[in-house]
Structures are given as structure tokens and as C-alpha cells.
UniProtKB/Swiss-Prot annotation:
UniProt name for this protein: Serine/threonine-protein phosphatase 2A activator
Organism lineage string: Eukaryota, Metazoa, Chordata, Craniata, Vertebrata
N-acetylalanine: residues carrying this PTM: 2
Domain of life: Eukaryota
Disease: Parkinson disease 25, autosomal recessive early-onset, with impaired intellectual development: An autosomal recessive, early-onset form of Parkinson disease, a complex neurodegenerative disorder characterized by bradykinesia, resting tremor, muscular rigidity and postural instability, as well as by a clinically significant response to treatment with levodopa. The pathology involves the loss of dopaminergic neurons in the substantia nigra and the presence of Lewy bodies (intraneuronal accumulations of aggregated proteins), in surviving neurons in various areas of the brain.
Record-listed ATP binding positions: 183, 188-189, 339, 342-343
Listed SUPFAM superfamilies: PTPA-like
Annotated source species: Homo sapiens (Human)
Subunit relationships: Associates with PP2A heterodimeric core enzyme PP2A(D), composed of a 36 kDa catalytic subunit (subunit C) and a 65 kDa constant regulatory subunit (PR65 or subunit A). Interacts with the catalytic subunit PPP2CA (via C-terminus). Interacts with PPP2CB.
């Protein structure tokens, strides 16, 4: 991938900070369009995009129903990293996830799924209210207030006690990841906050390289399910939607990782994702197709009209090219757009300072 802004991977010594590190409450740093230069040069940008690309490599060619024991993934991940150097998507930007001294399964994965299950249960406990407006049900604010109050307690169930000082910093990204309670909307900036939340857990050593596939297939996929339930239950508005010219009203990352899953698939090609039969038969295995199914459930009319950008992508000859193109598009349309990044928050784990060299 010929990207001009490649950054060197962060020093691995930063990946498992000592308990004495000064954690801080993340805050906004991008206040004007010229500030975007600080973001592009920041350690936060380098670590964030590296994290996204690392997971992109990890899920390549694998189904959501992939049966694995975390302890068996150690050698596989390192074999994939060797292969990645020969592939079109470079790992030069990849962030090295912290290595464990052993290959025992990570309890953090199951704890994160339990956390998301709690958010799901709260939706059931907070039904929509009757109101004149069709969109933006105000019951969402009640649901969000519960998360705002309990976020640190939830994160504390995932983070070990010796890293308890990190909880307030990490919890901010969780609260930012579920939508805006004032506007009752959700978009790719909120999705990015959840990826940042997971990235922070990796940087403090709660999640490890062994967890790479499970981060996407178990945790992020469960997050998607909860977000879709939020969107449907409370009729949330898309944040910053580009309408038919955008990729999707709400998500972007599952299209990237989902297209990576489909690279070198024996028979499913990009042209098949606009085929209703192919989607219905394979959506449980592939995030990309699950996204397409959700779109067709939520929108009416010809696919080419309500999702023109995706319709155009279906003409791309291979999934590897789709994947490369989506990564470039994500950078250009999400990470380099002021309306999205102005809401991103920076702390000690994802700092605004320029990327360190050497």
C-alpha cells in the first residue's frame, strides 16, 4: 500500500506502561481545521492506524465462525506477520500488541463481551418513550446516563487492579463510543472511539497479541450488534452522513476488516455482495456481508440508489483491492476529516504529541 504518511511502529516499551505512569483524562485537542496537522503527526494517529491495520492482517481469510483456542494463535499470528511483508497491505504502520509470557487465553476478551452484554441488557430495560418525533427517541438519554454513571465501574471489571489508575482514562473512550446523547446520533467518530478504547487496552497490556482475532470477531462484532440495536431501538440519526454518497450511515471498520476476511475466498467475489442469496447464505461468516444485510433491512428501494458507493465497490475485481481501497478511503473520509476528528480525545495512551522517531 503506497501511503505517503507511513509512521514507524511505536516503541514496544510503551506498550505495557508501569502502574506509576501518569494517566490523564483525555480531552479534545483538535479545535480548528489547521489543528488537523497535529493529529496527522501525532503518536495517537500512528498508534490508532497501526492498530487498525494489525487487526486487518489478523483476520485475513478467516470466518467469524472460525474455531480457535487463543493459545493456538501465537505461531499463526507471527506467520501472518512474515507473510504481510510480501502482501500489498504493508505492516509498516502496524502497532505491535504486547506479548505475554505465556499463551493462556485472555480473560479480558470474555470480560469485554460481558461488558457489552450489560449495555445490551440496559437497552431492554430502557424502552423507547412515546414522542411526536419519529427519530432520536429521548429514552436514549436515559440509557446513556446509565453508561455515563457506570462506565468506570464497567471498565474496572476488565482492567486488573494493578492498572486501576488507567480506568478513568480508558473509560472516556467507552463513553464516547456509543453515540451523542444531545443529538441522539451515531457515526464513524463514535466507532473510532471504540477502536481507540480497544487500542488503549492493548497499550496497557490488558489485551495481547494472542487476542488479535478475538478482538475483532468476539468483541468488536458484539459491539456492532449492540450499536445496531441502539440505532434501531432509539431511531438514532446518522452523525455526519453523506447520504447515498457515503459508504454507510453508521459504520466503516467492519467493511475494512470484513473485506480482509474475504481475501482469496474460493468463490465469493465483490460482485456477490449485491446478490441477496449470497448475502443470506454467508452473512454469519463475514462482517462485510452482515453489514450489507443490515443495510437492506433498514433501507428500501434499489441498492444502487440507497447505497451508491457500495454498489460501485461491487465492481472492483478482487477483495484485496477492495480492502486496500477502503483503507485509503477510511483515512481520507474519516481520519482526515475535521468534523470527525474534532471530537477525538487525547490522553497519555493516545497522545497528541508528535510521533517519536527511532
Amino acid at each position: 500500500m503506497a501511503e505517503g504518511e507511513r509512521q514507524p511502529p511505536p516503541d514496544s516499551s510503551e506498550e505495557a506502561p508501569p502502574a506509576t505512569q501518569n494517566f490523564i483524562i483525555p480531552k479534545k485537542e483538535i479545535h480548528t481545521v489547521p489543528d488537523m496537522g497535529k493529529w496527522k503527526r501525532s503518536q495517537a494517529y500512528a498508534d490508532y492506524i497501526g492498530f487498525i491495520l494489525t487487526l486487518n492482517e489478523g483476520v485475513k481469510g478467516k470466518k467469524l465462525t472460525f474455531e480457535y483456542r487463543v493459545s493456538e494463535m501465537w505461531n499463526e499470528v507471527h506467520e501472518e506477520k512474515e507473510q504481510a511483508a510480501k502482501q500489498s497491505v504493508s505492516c509498516d504502520e502496524c502497532i505491535p500488541l504486547p506479548r505475554a509470557g505465556h499463551c493462556a487465553p485472555s480473560e479480558a476478551i470474555e470480560k469485554l463481551v460481558a461488558l457489552l452484554n450489560t449495555l445490551d441488557r440496559w437497552i431492554d430495560e430502557t424502552p423507547p418513550v412515546d414522542q411526536p418525533s419519529r427519530f432520536g427517541n429521548k429514552a436514549y438519554r436515559t440509557w446513556y446516563a446509565k453508561l455515563d454513571e457506570e462506565a468506570e465501574n464497567l471498565v474496572a471489571t476488565v482492567v486488573p487492579t494493578h492498572l486501576a489508575a488507567a480506568v478513568p482514562e480508558v473509560a472516556v473512550y467507552l463513553k464516547e463510543s456509543v453515540g451523542n446523547s444531545t443529538r441522539i446520533d451515531y457515526g464513524t467518530g463514535h466507532e473510532a472511539a471504540f477502536a481507540a478504547f480497544l487500542c488503549c487496552l492493548c497499550k496497557i497490556g490488558v489485551l495481547r497479541v494472542d487476542d488479535q482475532i478475538a478482538i475483532v470477531f468476539k468483541v468488536f462484532n458484539r459491539y456492532l450488534e449492540v450499536m445496531r440495536k441502539l440505532q434501531k431501538t432509539y431511531r438514532m440519526e446518522p452523525a455526519g452522513s453523506q447520504g447515498v454518497w457515503g459508504l454507510d450511515d453508521f459504520q466503516f471498520l467492519p467493511f475494512i476488516w470484513g473485506s480482509s476476511q474475504l481475501i482469496d475466498h474460493p468463490y465469493l467475489e465483490p460482485r456477490h455482495f449485491v446478490d441477496e442469496k449470497a448475502v443470506n447464505e454467508n452473512h454469519k461468516d463475514y462482517m462485510f456481508l452482515e453489514c450489507i444485510l443490515f443495510i437492506t433491512e433498514m433501507k428500501t428501494g434499489p441498492f444502487a440508489e440507497h447505497s451508491n458507493q457500495l454498489w460501485n465497490i461491487s465492481a472492483v475485481p478482487s477483495w484485496s483491492k477492495v480492502n486496500q481501497g477502503l483503507i485509503r478511503m477510511y483515512k481520507a473520509e474519516c481520519l482526515e476529516k475535521f468534523p470527525v476528528i474534532q471530537h477525538f480525545k487525547f490522553g497519555s495512551l493516545l497522545p497528541i504529541h508528535p510521533v517519536t522517531s527511532g
